[in-house]
Amino acid sequence: MSRIGRMPIKIPPDVKITIEGNTVRVEGPKGRLEREIPANTKLVVENGRAVIEKAGEEKPGTAMLGLTRTLVANMVDGVTKGFQRNLELTGVGYRASLQGRKLVMTLGYSHPVEYEPPADIEIEVPAVTRIIIRGADKEKVGRVAAKIRSFRSPEPYKGKGVRYEGEKIRLKAGKAGLKKR
């Protein structure tokens, strides 16, 4: 049995978990999340703790325990604390701003790049070269951050582009130049 799958999930008092068939709904101060869990696992909520158990003795049920436990734990964390990803813009003239909910970025193209985030994702631009993405769903926050990063991924010669905060870009040496004769 999975070590992670065996660990119980602590449920804060302001979080409510409801189970209908294979659908798990988690409600808390930061929002409401819903997810389908695999049919060969079941969620048992008791005494402020949630435990993932196998529904049968098949091997796929055992294989999904750790994943299911982590997904439910992320849902609980998301509705209580929320998740955040930070992006940095590196390059001359690279900047970001918000126009309403729309993120507008100048990334060295001939046109500004605009991105409208999903309804439950919040984007903040505290500085022109910094973007903060917040939300309750960890998967969606990561997907939005990856989408914004994909507009101009860091290039390997000068490191210009949109990168995650703290991301290290391995720079290439570039051309060695012509040998002097």
Curated annotation (Swiss-Prot):
It comes from the Bacteria. Gene3D superfamilies: Ribosomal protein L6, alpha-beta domain. Belongs to the universal ribosomal protein uL6 family. This protein binds to the 23S rRNA, and is important in its secondary structure. It is located near the subunit interface in the base of the L7/L12 stalk, and near the tRNA binding site of the peptidyltransferase center. SUPFAM superfamilies: Ribosomal protein L6. GO terms for cellular component: cytosolic large ribosomal subunit. HAMAP family: Ribosomal_uL6_B (MF_01365_B). GO terms for biological process: cytoplasmic translation. Keywords: Ribonucleoprotein, Ribosomal protein, RNA-binding, rRNA-binding. Pfam families: Ribosomal_L6. GO terms for molecular function: rRNA binding; structural constituent of ribosome. It comes from Desulforudis audaxviator (strain MP104C). Part of the 50S ribosomal subunit. The keyword rRNA-binding applies. The lineage of its organism: Bacteria, Bacillati, Bacillota, Clostridia, Thermoanaerobacterales. NCBIfam families: L6_bact. The gene is rplF. PANTHER family: 60S/50S RIBOSOMAL PROTEIN L6/L9, LARGE RIBOSOMAL SUBUNIT PROTEIN UL6M. This is Large ribosomal subunit protein uL6.
